[in-house]
């Protein structure tokens, strides 16, 4: 029976860690999912994109006064004016994030429940490491050993340099993004601090 030993997990774990100040309890095998649940997960991305597109349209119409004001007010609550101005600028208006990260709860009988829908790539490096590591003994793991890495890389134009910008507030995610950038190639991917980041005009 295939399994990942604690020693092999420790040996594969990056010395710099994957998530700052966290420790992990790891399983000797991947969490099993039924074929029907896998199909449901694989179809989730398209449905979530449609949901976000509709939500964005509702927000934009509310901002313009074509729908009730409370819609935009609810979305805008607690956000600084500078962020609101940037989010409403023509450069990003109507754009849907390329990374959608739902937080899913798996129930015994009722299937999946979504508690949050995020659009930042936190967790991609960690999940990619899990896939790479477990695929050594379980080659049929969902996505294979490189699925998460190749999927992340594919959202950017081929050959284009990619800056992964991490804020101090989200610094806990930086180790996994450093690991991911190394796996994908430092000549193309680099990790930068958001607070000091400047776009290279070249």
Where are these regions (language model features)?
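Preference for protein termini
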Residues: 1-202
């Amino acid at each position: 029976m295939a399994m990942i030993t604690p020693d092999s997990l420790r040996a594969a774990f990056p010395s710099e860690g994957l998530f700052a100040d966290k420790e992990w309890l790891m399983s000797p095998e991947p969490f099993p999912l039924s074929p029907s649940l896998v199909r449901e997960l694989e179809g989730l991305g398209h449905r979530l994109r449609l949901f976000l597109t509709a939500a964005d349209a509702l927000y934009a119409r509310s901002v313009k006064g074509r729908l009730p004001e409370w819609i935009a007010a609810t979305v805008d609550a607690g956000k600084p004016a500078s962020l609101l101005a940037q989010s409403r600028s023509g450069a990003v208006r109507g754009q849907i994030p390329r990374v959608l990260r739902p937080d899913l709860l798996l129930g015994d009988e009722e299937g999946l429940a979504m508690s949050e829908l995020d659009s930042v790539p936190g967790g991609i490096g960690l999940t990619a490491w899990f896939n790479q590591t477990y695929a050594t003994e379980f080659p049929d793991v969902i996505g294979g050993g490189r699925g998460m890495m190749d999927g992340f890389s594919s959202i950017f134009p081929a050959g284009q340099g990619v800056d992964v910008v991490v804020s101090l507030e989200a610094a806990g995610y930086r180790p996994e993004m450093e690991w991911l950038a190394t796996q994908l190639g430092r000549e193309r991917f680099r990790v930068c601090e958001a607070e000091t980041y400047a776009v290279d005009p070249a």
